[in-house]
């Protein structure tokens, strides 16, 4: 993910991110879901982010793609439940996880990140248990809750300030 002003990112990088985070998730969810529904068995685990619940100044494309994954997963999960299907879709929405993401985006996180193995275990456990949304830490659950309460103009400012600190 690129960290900086939207106007400064390259269209090529934006489209690569959209292809990876949106198109690939959409295609794979659609293809696997048809088979799973016909067998009335299966689990889909889509990797989103806590960013999927917020706007993301300075990482606009990344946040937008994660919003897509979160929204798609939640909506399809609801549809499956309404159909009476045993198939589930889980949106895994962690905060910072120790991966190479930081180096790729050229950022450092101000908040502690969780180990990738810990995140993976939590995601798989929640998916197997049929959870619609999986948020692995209490702190990130508070972030999601807080994002619902804060007016959009303030949330945009907060998110922008957090991203600015990553690149400064």
What would you call each of these model-derived segments?
Residues 49:
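Residue(s) in the substrate-gating loop at a strand-loop-helix junction
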Residues 56-60:
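Active-site loop immediately N-terminal to the catalytic Tyr-X3-Lys motif
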Residues 29, 65:
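Active-site helix of classical SDR
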Residues 91, 108-144:
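C-terminal helical subdomain
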Residues 5-18:
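Substrate-binding pocket helix/loop in short-chain dehydrogenase/reductase
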Residues 94-104, 109:
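Short, flexible catalytic-loop segment of classical short-chain dehydrogenase/reductase
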Residues 35, 54, 75-87:
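Active-site-adjacent segment of SDR/Rossmann-fold oxidoreductases
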């Amino acid at each position: 993910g690129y960290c900086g002003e939207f106007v400064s990112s390259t269209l090529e990088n934006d489209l690569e991110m959209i292809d990876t985070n949106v198109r690939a998730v959409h295609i794979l969810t659609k293809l696997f879901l048809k088979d799973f529904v016909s067998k009335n068995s299966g689990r889909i685990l889509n990797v989103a982010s806590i960013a999927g619940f917020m706007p993301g100044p300075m990482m606009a494309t990344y946040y937008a793609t994660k919003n897509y994954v979160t929204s798609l997963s939640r909506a399809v999960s609801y549809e499956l439940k309404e159909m009476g299907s045993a198939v589930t879709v889980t949106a895994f929405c962690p905060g910072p996880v120790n991966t190479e993401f930081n180096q790729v985006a050229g950022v450092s996180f101000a908040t502690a990140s969780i180990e990738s193995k810990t995140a993976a275990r939590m995601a798989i456990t929640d998916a197997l248990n049929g959870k619609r949304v999986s948020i692995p830490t209490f702190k990130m659950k508070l972030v999601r809750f807080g994002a619902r309460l804060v007016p959009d103009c303030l949330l945009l400012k907060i998110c922008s300030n957090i991203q600015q600190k990553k690149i400064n």
